[in-house]
Amino acid sequence: MSKRKYKTQNIFVVTLSLLSLLSMPINLNAAEFEFKFHHFLPSTSPAHITMIEPWVKKIEEESSGRVKIDIYPSMTLGGRPADLVSQARNGVVDLIWTSNGYTPGQFPRTELFELPLIHTNNPEKTGEVMHKMFSEYLAEDYSGLKVLFLHVHAGNVFQSVRKEITNINSFRGMKVRTPSRTGSWTLDELGSESISVPMPDVVQTLSKNIIDAALIPYEIIPTFKLNEYTKYQVEGYDGFRFGTLTFQLSMNRDKWDTLPDDIKRIFQANSDLSQWKKAGNIWQINDNDGLDYAMGNGNIHKILGYDETEEIKNRLKRTHDVWLKELSKENIDGVPILEKAIELMGE
């Protein structure tokens, strides 16, 4: 091959390569910081629509496009709800929203706020107290994670398939779905058999009569059409609930540590005390809507009497002792945490 022909071919190849590069779309607005956000509920759930999506959108907007957060609901990146914490800790995903109850014993200090008579059917107040106590009393639960905010739902009620609950004796012998080990402690004290079932599987266990009732808030009724599988929604006098669940929205710690300060400040500004309280308020509103939905579809809202509720409260105080014993097994003194929580919840 002559040098002239060889040179001509090279020029032709280089020209084609340049034209190919020039024809490729160039995204001048590509985000500098991209995040995978994984959680366990459907994109149609109130939590996704009213809490997660607005939070994500606000951070993206305040970063002027430098941050892009892709949300993956319903465990679409794989695994079970119980895997979310390890996925975040191991960097499989960047952000998670999950119930602490899916990983029993991993957040022992925080479990206090799930107990009956600590949470008093005011999720905004519970969020405020958790925020005040986080650095000194709760942070050790969250190694490998950067907690952005914690919250609780409005509180567990008994959603019964067919049995009408009238007093403390009604619970005895019932098979009840529990969302957490703290829920199991509650059911143990009431004489019920607890069956651990993640939220996405509750409908199946109800429809197959594996359980007689589910310990769950009203909020999620419309998403899973729980009114079609239950008849009674039962709570105590004056809004008394049978404990609650704690949730976390957290980031992989290594991911957090690599972020520049200005991006960190955007996340922090949207995860301050007002957000911890706001999350609780969102869940209270959604809970009210869920109850209205059930009643509007023919379900029966049962409120136990004052005397019956007081008897239940006295029984469920024992769950505090169970929690203290569990912490002592981990060489954690739970008494100061319990005393501080009671003090702040009473303010």
Question: What is each residue range found by the language model?
Answer:
Residues 4-5, 22, 60:
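A subset of signal/propeptide-processing and intrinsically disordered low-complexity segments
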Residues 24-30:
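Sec/Tat signal peptide C-region and signal peptidase I cleavage site
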Residues 120-137:
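A gly/proline- and charged-residue-enriched helix-loop-helix capping module
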Residues 31-122, 140-347:
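N-terminal secretory/targeting leader peptides
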